[in-house]
């Protein structure tokens, strides 16, 4: 993965509320446990008319050639609701999305996204409405998402967003749970040594 400082990419508008994880990736494609190869199943039942992926749905937004290389997904509230499948995040990343913008996300989906370095940006509904109007009038427009400055630049407008300081720091430095554990390994070692010493003293005292 990469250190996320800022990203400039084409925005695909998916103007649907309450998109659940089964819509993001149907359950029949969850057999694998590695993170690669799920992009082709993203929004499967919306992208394809037949189950064998031989006939695409021409009315689905991601099948529009303008959004072929879209890396930012703009959507409506409660994105990622439903079951806790991490494969939903894997499919979005494998497809090429690096940022999802919405007014709200499911808690479990939000945490899964953070753990996999997919940036979720939460904006007020008025800003989401503005962005949908913008992408409708300027089809194929790109947004700049700056994690350093915590803002989205869309057209002539800069929209600030909030993000947890710890999550921001991890994304900026590409830290995962292993990296964080290694950074405090000396504290863990010191704690373990103290516990061992305490237990030894207690054992000697009671014997």
Swiss-Prot record:
Alphabetized UniProt keyword annotations: Amino-acid biosynthesis, Branched-chain amino acid biosynthesis, Leucine biosynthesis, Lyase, Plasmid
GO biological process, one term: L-leucine biosynthetic process
Family matches, as InterPro entries: 3-IsopropMal_deHydase_ssu, Aconitase/3IPM_dehydase_swvl, AconitaseA/IPMdHydase_ssu_swvl, IPMI_Swivel, LeuD
Enzyme Commission (EC) number: 4.2.1.33
Catalytic activity: (2R,3S)-3-isopropylmalate = (2S)-2-isopropylmalate
Broad class of enzyme this protein falls into: lyase
Pathway(s) annotated for this protein in UniProt: Amino-acid biosynthesis; L-leucine biosynthesis; L-leucine from 3-methyl-2-oxobutanoate: step 2/4
A Pfam family that the UniProt record links to this protein: Aconitase_C
Gene3D superfamilies: Aconitase, domain 4
GO terms for cellular component: 3-isopropylmalate dehydratase complex
Region forming the signal peptide: none
Keyword Lyase: yes
Keyword Cell cycle appears in the UniProt entry: no
Coiled-coil portions: none
Function: Catalyzes the isomerization between 2-isopropylmalate and 3-isopropylmalate, via the formation of 2-isopropylmaleate.
Matching NCBIfam families: leuD, PRK01641.1
HAMAP family, per database record: LeuD_type1
Family: Belongs to the LeuD family. LeuD type 1 subfamily.
Self-association state and partner proteins as the record states: Heterodimer of LeuC and LeuD.
Name of the protein in its database record: 3-isopropylmalate dehydratase small subunit
Organism: Buchnera aphidicola subsp. Rhopalosiphum padi
């Amino acid at each position: 993965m990469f250190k996320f400082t800022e990203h400039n990419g084409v925005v695909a508008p998916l103007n649907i509320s309450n998109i659940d994880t089964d819509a993001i990736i149907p359950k029949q494609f969850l057999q694998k446990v590695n993170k690669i190869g799920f992009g082709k199943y993203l929004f499967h039942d919306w992208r394809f008319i037949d189950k064998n992926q031989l006939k695409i749905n021409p009315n689905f937004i991601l099948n529009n050639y303008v959004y072929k290389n879209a890396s930012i997904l703009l959507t409506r509230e409660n994105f990622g609701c439903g079951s806790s499948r991490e494969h939903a995040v894997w499919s979005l990343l494998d497809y090429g999305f690096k940022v999802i913008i919405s007014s709200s996300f499911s808690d479990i989906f939000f945490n899964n996204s953070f753990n996999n370095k997919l940036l979720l940006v939460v904006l007020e509904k008025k800003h989401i409405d503005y962005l949908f109007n913008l992408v409708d009038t300027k089809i194929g427009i790109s947004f700049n998402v700056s994690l350093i400055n915590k803002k989205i630049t869309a057209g002539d407008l800069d929209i600030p967003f909030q993000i947890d300081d710890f999550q921001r720091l991890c994304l900026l430095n590409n830290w995962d749970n292993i990296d964080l554990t290694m950074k405090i390994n000396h504290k863990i070692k010191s704690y373990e040594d103290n516990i061992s010493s305490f237990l030894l003293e207690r054992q000697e005292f009671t014997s």
